């Protein structure tokens, strides 16, 4: 039965042209990370505010990335991915802090395709009001990092709601 299972898996992988996970070829984000001495206590990794970096991938089978198989990431004035936002939210705006790791950050995903941006667009339309979803996430963060960041910085954004996206590898 093991041989039969392996043969079936091989057929499935060939039929669906599954090539497996491709990690970024280059991680040109070293300059975008704060030195350890500047990190908030209990937070593993943070970005330098107002910076950009690019990750390039081995292939671009769906034509999603740029001509160099890369994707640029913009880090705002708060050291978070996405456009700048005011510390004080506008009256009538529902502000959501979306807390997570690389999944929420959107590694390998254009800004408009991130979970937070999709949620913001969908909720704004559904609720017929201004909704602001803040992408409070960094690749490599665990639940410990998320709680530390939220308590030291994230609550200063005065969210109406905090959503924690929990992926199994976040357990700590």
For the regions a protein language model found, what residue spans apply to each?
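A secondary-structure boundary/capping signal
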Residues: 99-100, 137, 167
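Conserved beta-strand elements of the Class I
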Residues: 95-99, 134, 162
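Membrane/wall-proximal cationic-aromatic binding patches
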Residues: 21-122, 126
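A conserved hydrophobic secondary-structure block that centers on an alpha-helix together
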Residues: 120-156
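Hydrophobic membrane-insertion alpha-helices, especially the h-region
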Residues: 1-12
